[in-house]
Every structure is written in structure tokens, then in C-alpha cells.
Amino acid sequence: MTHLPAAVRIKFLRRLFMNKPNHVALRNPVGHWVPERVADRPAPNERGGAASTSATPAPGSNFLRAIIADDNANATYGGRVVTRFPPEPNGYLHYGHAKSIVLNFGLAAENGGTCHLRFDDTNPLKEDVEYEDSIAASVRWLGYDWGTHRYHASDYYDVLYEFAEWFVTEGLAYVDSQTADEVRATRGTLTQPGTPGPYRDRSVDENLDLLRRMRAGEFADGAHVLRLRIDMASPNLNMRDPVIYRIRHTRHHRTGDKWCLYPLYDYTHCISDALERVTHSICTLEFQDHRPLYDWVIEKLAEGGRLPRPLPRQYEFARLNLTYVVLSKRKLLQLVEDGHVDGWDDPRMPTLVGARRRGFTPAGFRLFAERIGVSKSDSWIDMSVLEETMRDELNATTVRRMAVLDPIRLVIENYPDGESEETFAPNHPQQPDLGRRAIPLSRELWIEREDFAETPPKGYFRLTPGAEVRLRHGYIIRCTGFDKDESGNVTTVRCTYDPATRSGTPGADARKVKGNIHWLSVAHAVPAEVRLYDRLFRVPFPGARISGDETPAEGAEPAPTHAIVLAGEEVDAAEDRERNFLDDLNPASKRIITAFVEPALANAVAEDHFQFERHGYFVADLVDHNPERLVFNRTVTLRDSWSKKPG
């Protein structure tokens, strides 16, 4: 399907992922091996946690399940299944991480195994304990528990360095003293091989001496790097003597000033997997070209008796590509720092902390991950698939309430002045066991401004002069007139009601009307701040354009980006096909209004979810909602309003 235009693929995917799977949860321990020097690690067969949620989607078909099933059938790992989720603690998790979390913890749970939470804390310039705490909280929020299996790459710094010295003594690594520009010049290209640098043939003794002096802090940042000696002519750039250690005189948030020599990810994560006895190392497709290096490092160490067999295997799956959002850390940081959003937990942000405030649910993310499946090829998922999944989950679980967002006054002229009564409405129309609540009705009501029209358009079945509608869960009313202010705006709608038509009473449905509107008693309604959130961007691919064109092309996909390591520094590929993604911000992505809600909502607490009847799904804000100040955020509308928008 990847050959199809993006717009066609999006329409196909929106129709495809609408099944509703069942749910399971499993838990079982697995063994764990580490060298003697890492004495604080759990011993083999120590009990640990797997997915501990009661709402994990049931297994569906994907290639990773088939691989694990085959390994289990062949006893490749003795029946063990150990996965891991290894985020770098340099930012907040986003929607794409949710897919990986659900996948890794879910596969472990399905097979009675464990999933490790490991922080890849190898770059002290960017990492902080704040991010670690947020990441751990987000994983727990999604419904998963790593038990005793919470680790850090820095747990293994001593062992990693010991292995680095071993690579040097075996003639498999050397200290390179070239500058970053010099390394780049000798690296070669995708079509031309690299050339050996002047320091590639240093003696073992000289390399070992330099490496130990690097560790001792004798050299400045960038003076030397440690590289593996593999093959400068390899067609795979990652195998052209990759850098595995760099000098950085920077305090680490866990190890303090103990180290000024830090390992790089490609060297660290494969060894960490092997130390933790991970069986299936699952990552996204951009690491596919790194797999030969992954295998080379741990295979050499196993051959040297430094790691146990069987070794972990790396498998790649397609990352989440979602329309109408950006997931790049650089772009997300720009949105925050430039004030385009109200922080990392802004409900419009595709971060998990933002999703939580938006009202997206853990069960919704798990269901979304199951619906979109696991693929080996990149494709785009339309935002409507995620939104529809959240609607399905919220529709099944949230109670109903009434809220008037744009109120005008309605007076029932034949209703006794000063009196009121209780009408009753189900908390959930499909779940009678959730009971019902009382809603007070009186002479003066609030209704939505759009539910009255002086001159109605064709097909309008709500309130108009002389027309009848039913007050939801109440009476049938007939419009007898209306008042306007000096500017010609309708201020009050006047009606009469039929006492014989009260909902739920005998004969109430004898007279049928097409219109049905919601309302609130003016005397009893509770004011609330309502934040109407929508998509942050107004186009599917923010910033995308055809090369040389200054306007976005229909269905155009963003230019691919990647990073390589030169002399220990990550270098991003130029995004020369992008224009400014900020030009595509949606100016209507946030609107704050003062509305009225039914009295029952005065008792709502933060993170309570509701369907505001006829409006959509809302949540009491995690941060700002309190008994003195009711604040509700719109999660999603009742129906997809974007599919009909132009462009």
C-alpha cells in the first residue's frame, strides 16, 4: 500500500481499523542475568512485573507475535519472553511512544513474560530526573507495571567501560584523535566507501593508555573518541568504525562527576539488552540499518565469553506516523519555548501528559495500538482513527450530562412562577445499571443559541416561531415569540409547555416532534469554564511541501529525517523539503468560554470523564479544576468534523 498517494492511504486506514477486540491481562516472572560487577541487579528468576492492566487489547495478528510464537515453539530462549521499553530521559513521551509501550508490555504479557523499563541516560547534556519521573508516570498511567525491572544504562557504566577496554585489547577498537570534520571527510557516502583515518592502526598499548587517560579526565571534550574497528568500506555507514565513546565533562544526574567519558546508544543498548537477558529487542524502522552493529557488538562479546547465550535479537516495526501532529522533539520544544502552546501538558500537544489533560484514556491508547497493528513498512494513520478510537472507548464508559455552551434564555410562560420540579435522565442510555440522575426544571431555562432560529434554513427541526420541540428528558414546548436587543440579537425565547408530555409518563409520546434540545434551569445551572480544544494544526502534514515549492502540496509527506554519529556528535540530516511548520498552526485549536452545566457536575473531580449531550466528550481538568472553579476540557466532539473540511 506504500505506493499509493498519502491521501488515498489515509482514507483506506480510516475505514480499516474499526474492530473492537476483547481484553486480557497476564503476569509471570522471567530470569535475569548480569555479570558479578553489577551486584545490585536482581538475581535469576526474581519475580517482576508484566503488564498489570485489565484492559489490554486481546492479541491480534502481527509479525512480532509470529516470531515470538516460533521462538517459544523452538525453545530458543527456554520459553522466556523479555522485552524492554528504553526511552531517553530528555523529554516527555508522545503518542508514538504509547504505541511502543503497548507493544512491548503487551507482547510480554501475552507470553507470560516481563517488560523492562530502562532509561537510556547516556547523554548528560540533555537528561534530567524530571523527565524520568514523567516517563515512569506515563507508563503507569497507560496501565503497565515493570515490577522490579526498572533500570538505567548508567547502571552498566562500569561494565560497559570494562568491555570497551576488552575491545581495545582484542584489537577491535581504537582511539581516534581526528576532529569531527576530519572524521566526516573520511567516512564516505552511501555510494562511496570510507577511508581509514591516520589513527586507525595505533597499537593496543597506545590505545589502552589513551582510553584510560580519557576516562581520567585528562583531555578536553572532543579531543578523542573511541571507535570500533570494523570495516570502513562497508556499504552500511553504521559499520564504518562507529564511535562508541566520547568525552563530555558534564555532570550526570545519577552518577554525578564520576564519569567524563560516556558511551553512545548503539554500543550501550545492545549490551544492556544482553545483560538484562532481553530476548526480543523491538525498535522502530530507523534502527534497521543499525541491527548489523547491534549483532556485531554482542556477538564479539559472546565469543569472548563476556556475554551469555542465547543473545537477544533486534526486530523493527514501523513507527507511528500520525497526521495533523508533529512528533519531532525539536519541533515540540519550539512549540513550547515560543509560546504557541501552554506547556508540555497542553491538551493540544501530542505528549502523553497533554493527552491525559485532554481526556484521552489509557484504554483508548491500548485499543488504538491494537487497531492500527504492527507493520514492517511506514504508512500514515489519520488523526481521525485515534479520535474515533477515543470516542468508542469513552462512549462505552462515560456518564452523560447536559451543558449549555452558548446560552440564551428561554421562558416557559405557562409554567408556574417560582416553582421547579425534578426530571430524570439515565446516566448512560445503554447501561441502566449506572442509574439515573435528577435534573431540576423551572420556568426559566438556558438553551443553546443555535437551537433557535428566527428564519430557519431547510431541514431545521429545532425551535422556531410556532414550532414544537421536546426538552430533552422533559416536556414538549411550543415557541410563541422572542425578544431582541437594540442590535437585533435574540435575547429571550418565549414558549408554552404541554404538561401531559413529560418524558417517562404515560402518554408522553402520543404526540411526536422531530426536534429534541437540551437545556438547564437558570436557577440551578452551575457556571463552568469550558475549554474547546481542537487539532493543533490545520493540515495533515504540517510544514510539508514539494521541493522548490513554497506551498504545501495536497497529500505531501514530510521529508524523512535521520541522524548519524560523527566523532561522537549526532548530526541531523537536512530537512530541505520543509517549510515552516508553524505556518500551519490552527488558530481555532483552543477557545475558552464560560458555560452552564447541570448541578450534578458541581461534584466532579479532576479527571472525571463525561459526555456533554449533543456536544462531545469532556474531562474535568487535571490541573485547574476544583470545587470553586469548574474547568472542563473537550476531549473529542461527538462526530468527526474534519472529514468534511476542505484541503
Tell what function each PLM region has.
Residues 291, 295-297, 370-373, 380-647:
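Core subunits and conserved enzymes of cellular information-processing
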Residues 6-8, 24, 559:
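Acidic, Ala/Val/Gly-enriched low-complexity intrinsically disordered segments
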Residues 82-90, 115-122, 274-282, 346-352, ...:
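Glycine- and acidic
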Residues 21-23, 28-196, 259, 286-314, ...:
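N-terminal Rossmann-like or analogous alpha/beta NTP/dinucleotide-binding catalytic cores
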Residues 309-389:
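Long, charged, mostly alpha-helical binding arms that flank functional sites
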